[in-house]
């Protein structure tokens, strides 16, 4: 059996290209953002998300992250505007985090790493299926939100309370009536660039919208996330931490800012 990718030394990001060659491609994510090199693009429009809370379906521990899955069979929960030329359907969101509060985000800003990074994954519905969208350079749009330590975020607690039902790898539970826009920061300013999924197969099909303003969560809330296990039930427990990919070479790509 082919070895499964992961985040350990033997199957971690340095090895992903052995099974998924595109992981060494020219448009890989995440990247380090250096704000002095980023230009404001006045043509970038504001973005808007209109999410139907009824489209939230389940929450899942896949051993790599916790993921909330949405019904994307029709245009229910949509992302529009910004750098996008078409509406995109919300498919899922998930998080990346570290073993302590001082790191865990995948993107960094002027050397600053945050405690976690939330990714909301949308696909361009003109391509008819998520699988088809993965083959297009503008097939997927991901909103990235940084989580920093500070005051507790009440809206985030709804998600954390569901984690007790999915402690171990392979567990899934109903998670309904949730509008993830409650997790957005007040400020909608963003950076945008063309990149990839940060997990294998690392397809280069993503228009990234990285929000400038982080949201705050408490130390206790982050600890709850780290209480998940990457091991299955009745196996020796292994904590699910350090599920982030290090920065990839920017290779001449341009990052643009929606703000001055």
Report the location of each language-model feature.
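Alpha-carbonic anhydrase
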Residues: 1-260
């Amino acid at each position: 059996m082919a070895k499964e990718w992961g985040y350990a030394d033997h199957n971690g990001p340095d090895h992903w290209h052995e099974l998924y060659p595109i992981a060494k491609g020219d448009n890989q994510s995440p990247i380090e953002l250096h704000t002095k090199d980023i230009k404001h693009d006045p043509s970038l429009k504001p973005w808007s998300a209109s999410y139907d809370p009824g489209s939230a379906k389940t929450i899942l521990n896949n051993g790599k992250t916790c993921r909330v899955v949405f019904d994307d069979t029709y245009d229910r929960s949509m992302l529009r505007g910004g750098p996008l030329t078409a509406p995109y359907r919300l498919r899922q969101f998930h998080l990346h985090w570290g073993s302590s509060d001082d790191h865990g985000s995948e993107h960094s800003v002027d050397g600053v790493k945050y405690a976690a990074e939330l990714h909301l994954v949308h696909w361009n519905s003109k391509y008819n299926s998520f699988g088809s969208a993965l083959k297009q350079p503008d097939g997927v749009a991901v909103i990235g939100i940084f989580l920093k330590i500070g005051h507790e975020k009440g809206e985030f607690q709804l998600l954390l309370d569901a984690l007790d039902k999915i402690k171990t790898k392979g567990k899934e539970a109903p998670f309904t009536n949730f509008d993830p826009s409650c997790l957005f920061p007040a400020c909608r300013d963003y950076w945008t660039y063309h990149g990839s999924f940060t997990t294998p197969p690392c397809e280069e099909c993503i228009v990234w919208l990285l929000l400038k303003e982080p949201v705050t969560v408490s130390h206790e809330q982050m600890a709850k996330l780290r209480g998940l296990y990457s091991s299955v039930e009745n196996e020796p427990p292994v904590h699910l931490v350090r599920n982030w990919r290090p920065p990839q070479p920017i290779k001449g790509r341009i990052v643009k800012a929606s703000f001055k």
